[in-house]
Amino acid sequence: MSCKDNIVWGSTARRVEFDGCIVHGYADEQMTPEAALRVGAAFASRFALPAKAAVCASGEPISVVLKYAVLAGIASQGVDAEAVNAASMSAFSYTVRKTGCAGGIYVNNNGRNAELVLFDENGIELSPDAMRSVRAGFLFGEQKPTLDAELGIIGNLNGLEEAYEQRLLCGIWREMMLNNKRTLRIGAPEQSGRVISRVLLRLGWNVERSCAENGLSPVFDENTI
């Protein structure tokens, strides 16, 4: 990272600016990782759980650092944070809309200026009312979780798995699942088993994997799905 890509790691940096659907500031003075984390937390605190939000960076070193700060802020509010590989803003907007996310944040670096562009569940730039809510949450300060169970899961979006996961979620009676949490053992191929596990974890269930040994099929019992 060159001198011109310097980042100040301090909570005493000057406050960032909210302009339309964008939160921006100088990367070496205002938009610190701590500030980006607070924006992510304020953005995620508006969602009804369970929920997930996507985060993407334009690819510059500064934007990648801020991306991980935003992911941590989202997860701190119990919302699952999904990292998306570097992509254009229009491609990210499409990803948010098609993967069942409650919203998304695109981290862009324009010279010295770093900006976070906020999207709703339809991949549309956040409305003025929603941005006022995010700004109020940002100014309110930290809302720290008290239990590990209150933290969201940080994962990666890869397209096909997320589409399958969204289809499973659409066919689940969420209220019943949330009110009847238990532990299940899953016997399934690696890829589908991973998706099913994530769905159950999002709903607060405990998951045990039953793996095949010596080339045999996974072992099933009365708790296996």
Language-model-detected regions and their locations in the chain:
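An N-terminal, well-structured beta->alpha segment
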Residues: S2-V70, I74-Q77, E150-L184
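Gly/Ser/Thr-enriched, mixed-charge loops and adjacent short helices
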Residues: D5-T12, A114-I225
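Active-site flanking residues adjacent to catalytic metal/cofactor-binding acidic residues
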Residues: C21, V107, R185-P189
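Short, glycine-/Ser/Thr-/acidic-enriched flexible segments
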Residues: V23-H24, E60, N110-G111, G123, ...
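Short, flexible active-site loop motifs that bind/organize anionic cofactors or intermediates
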Residues: Y26, E82, E121
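Generic alpha-helical propensity signal that fires on short helical segments
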Residues: A36, A41, L71-G73, R97-T99, ...
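N-terminal small/polar loop signature for handling phosphorylated ligands or for N-terminal nucleophile
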Residues: K52-A114, R198-I225
